């Protein structure tokens, strides 16, 4: 009624009925329900929270992968080694490999318990300091795995071969890391098959196929300054991907009291 006007104005989000509500209520409300059906509000909250969570997932993925690239380049420079990645390879990492999984993470479906979470403080930053600590930790694990493979390969195969190994190892590790960023509270083994995301799976497969194509064709190998890989070296790349993925999962388990990785919480 008319007396609802002050309450609607004082509320964080005022909701009025489009048909049954008064003119005063509709004028001061933030949301007017055209069909007078409150069920639409529940669905809107669910989708709104999912959008907020997906933005955080995309930021988590992009910041952690870029942190890993920074660590790889700085780590090699500090010890006085040759560049582990060429400018062309870095450009490929940022323009051809990272965007597809990031875009697909933005389309992740709402998590089953999204409505059980308390509302977020609208004044809080989208990423809190605790979030950055987790993101940087994940980037360090990705970068350290690539650096370890680079230095181990460099002593036995030479700079070009080692650069090829770290290029593929880091790129594929970042692509797979997109699967680990699907949930803030559950690990990759809990979300990989229980909550399918065809868009993300397609993006990961396409990114991996593009990466494989760069290595297969002689023209792209020359363009990116890559060397042919033996079976043993290919298995080493697979080991780098597994080490970074499992490493992040294990560390996420150890720093959290529950069964899943440490959740990203906005306080």
Q: Whereabouts are the PLM-identified features?
A:
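Membrane-embedded transport module
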Residues: 18-188
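Hydrophobic residues in alpha-helical membrane-spanning segments
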Residues: 6, 100-102, 219
């Amino acid at each position: 009624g008319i007396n609802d006007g002050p309450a609607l104005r004082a509320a964080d989000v005022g909701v009025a009925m489009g048909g049954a509500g008064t003119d005063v209520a509709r004028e001061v409300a933030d949301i007017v329900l055209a069909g007078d059906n409150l069920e639409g509000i529940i669905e809107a909250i669910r989708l709104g929270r999912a959008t907020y969570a997906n933005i955080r997932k995309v930021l988590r993925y992009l910041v952690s992968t870029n942190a890993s690239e920074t660590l790889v380049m700085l780590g090699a420079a500090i010890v006085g080694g040759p560049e582990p990645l060429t400018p062309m390879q870095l450009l490929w990492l940022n323009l051809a490999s990272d965007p597809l999984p990031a875009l697909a993470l933005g389309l992740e479906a709402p998590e089953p318990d999204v409505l059980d979470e308390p509302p977020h403080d609208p004044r809080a930053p989208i990423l809190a300091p605790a979030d950055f600590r987790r993101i940087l930790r994940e980037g360090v694990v990705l970068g350290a795995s690539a650096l370890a493979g680079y230095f181990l390969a460099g002593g036995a195969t030479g700079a070009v071969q080692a650069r090829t190994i770290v290029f593929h190892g880091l790129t594929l590790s970042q692509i797979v890391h997109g699967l680990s960023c699907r949930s803030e509270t559950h690990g990759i083994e809990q979300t990989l098959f229980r909550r399918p995301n065809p868009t993300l799976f397609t993006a990961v497969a396409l990114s991996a196929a593009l990466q494989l194509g760069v290595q297969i064709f002689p023209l792209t190998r020359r363009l990116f300054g890559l060397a042919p890989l033996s079976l043993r070296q290919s298995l080493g790349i697979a080991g780098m991907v597994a080490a970074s993925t499992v490493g992040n999962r294990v560390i996420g388990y150890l720093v959290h009291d529950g069964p899943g990785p440490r959740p990203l919480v906005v306080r």
